[in-house]
Amino acid sequence: MIEGSVRYIDNEPMSSSSKNLFGFHAVGVRIKTAPKSVFEVFYDVQRRDARMRAFTDRARDSGIKLVESDGLRLAKMCGSHGHQGVVARVDALAQVTSLDELLENLEASGENLGVNASVKNPLLLVLDGVTDPHNLGACLRVADGAGAHAVIAPKDHAAGISAIVSKVASGAAETMPYFMVTNLARTLGELKERNIWCIGTSDDAEKTIYDVDLTGPIALVLGAEGEGMRQLTRKTCDQLVSIPMHGAVESLNVSVASGVCLYEALRQRRAV
């Protein structure tokens, strides 16, 4: 049994089922995909630019309750000054509750549950020790874009889903299943029992991401920038690959590295 859960961390006390989203992209995606889950949208009346007018017009056309506010109150609501003048109070969406359930659905249907129809086999992104919410948000965004089925991280020493993560993810935090597991190495072992090939990234690996077959069921495992994967995580992987670096810098940010790996997998799968 693979243990998994989606954890939300809110910056403002609310009911157990509600949370705050902020930023044009995150709120806009929620209004577009699940308007009935949006209780109300607070917006900065001091913003009178074209983008704000277009946003409030779309929200109003969708039947969303609009509440006039100001920048300071919005910052207090979401815990960030990067709200762009928009904060929404929303209901938590129904999520796949466990990684087991997700994988069983994939196995039963044999069809892609992600956004890209060319992805037939499970494509998972595993993050080991990624604690920065901006990095997590960017990883969720690229995982959603590449058609990955889920992102997995350990419960300890990892960022949870917060308003900042949702804002950076630009709506992907609402659509991409994010599972936080008790024991990452054990979870990788259980994925391997399901014939999912676990491929870790390492600067000293002989083969590059472009040298391996990514068309089968795979989990791409990446560590935090600088520290990399923990030793046990590294040992549990079936194979290690590197991302070739041809310039002065030695490594990529974890979200950029995730994008390189996921889109190489997508490229290979589209060619099959």
Label every model-predicted segment.
Residues L72-M77, A94-V96, L184-L188, E206-K207, ...:
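A short acidic, often aromatic-flanked loop/helix-cap motif at beta-alpha or helix-coil junctions
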Residues H25, V29-K36, Y43, R47, ...:
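RNA substrate-binding interface of SAM-dependent RNA methyltransferases
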Residues M1-E107, E111, V115:
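N-terminal positively charged helical leader segments and presequences
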Residues D70, D91, D128, P154-K155, ...:
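Short beta->alpha connector loops at strand-helix junctions that form conserved
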Residues G28, D144-G145, A150, S166-A172, ...:
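Structured adenosyl-cofactor binding patch, chiefly the S-adenosyl-L-methionine
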Residues R60, L188-K192, L266:
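Surface-exposed amphipathic alpha-helices with a cationic face
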Residues M77-A92, A169-A173, P177, V181, ...:
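Short basic, glycine-rich beta-strand/loop surfaces that mediate nucleic-acid
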Residues I199-V249, N253-S255:
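Active-site/ligand-binding-proximal alpha/beta "capping" segment
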